[in-house]
């Protein structure tokens, strides 16, 4: 019984990576420094049917180590709560209309920091993730899947133009690298 000699080059070749469910069905778009606040980056997952899922980008301060989320609130003002959004029918009647800068929720951390998460996309609010109200930790554990913030449906006419002010994955990675270089050069 002879054994074939092992090919050392084959051991070094990486296995073809299977794309995640999110990467397979969604295109990632990013909005860096939302409302001029440094590092407060948002990620918009756009499906081919134009639905957009609003999540936190990996560099957002809430997702950094050491942060603990105390609570999350969809109560934007005394008269406006995203939880009151009731959508019905084929034409999504009753959905709240959002602009790019419309606040979706507020995240309160145990260190006293407060972060307002914005829509980044014009459209109708389809749903908010009520699961993060009861278990805020999933926002940090699974930000692109179970820890999403909200689902927004852009107007059909605007569905192609919503990505104009957003960054691609590669452009966003370049922004993060520049940010890291700037902080290491300053220290």
Swiss-Prot record:
Its main location: nucleus. One of its GO terms (cellular component) is filopodium tip. The keyword Nucleus applies. The keyword Nucleus applies. It is found in: Nucleus speckle; Cell projection, Lamellipodium; Nucleus; Cell projection, Growth cone. Belongs to the ABITRAM family. Interacts with F-actin. Interacts with G-actin. Keywords: Actin-binding, Cell projection, Nucleus. Actin-binding protein that regulates actin polymerization, filopodia dynamics and increases the branching of proximal dendrites of developing neurons. May play a role in transcription regulation. InterPro entries: Abitram, GCV_H/Fam206, Single_hybrid_motif. The gene is ABITRAM. This is Protein Abitram. One of its GO terms (biological process) is dendrite morphogenesis.
């Amino acid at each position: 019984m002879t054994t074939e000699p092992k090919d050392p080059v084959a051991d070094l070749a990486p296995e073809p990576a299977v794309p995640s469910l999110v990467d397979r069905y969604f295109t990632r778009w990013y909005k860096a420094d939302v409302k001029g606040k440094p590092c407060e980056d948002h990620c918009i997952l756009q499906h081919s049917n134009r639905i957009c899922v609003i999540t936190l980008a990996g560099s957002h301060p809430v997702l950094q180590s050491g942060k603990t989320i105390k609570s999350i609130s969809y109560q934007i003002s005394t008269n406006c709560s995203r939880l009151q959004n009731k959508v019905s029918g084929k034409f999504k009647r009753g959905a709240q209309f959002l602009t790019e800068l419309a606040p979706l929720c507020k995240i309160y951390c145990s260190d006293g920091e407060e972060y307002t998460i914005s829509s980044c996309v014009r459209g109708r609010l389809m749903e908010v993730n009520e699961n993060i109200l009861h278990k805020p930790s999933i926002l940090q554990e699974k930000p692109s899947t179970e820890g999403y913030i909200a689902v927004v449906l852009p107007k059909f006419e605007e569905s192609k133009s919503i990505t104009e002010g957003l960054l691609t994955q590669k452009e966003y990675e370049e922004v993060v690298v520049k940010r890291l270089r700037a902080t290491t050069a300053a220290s």
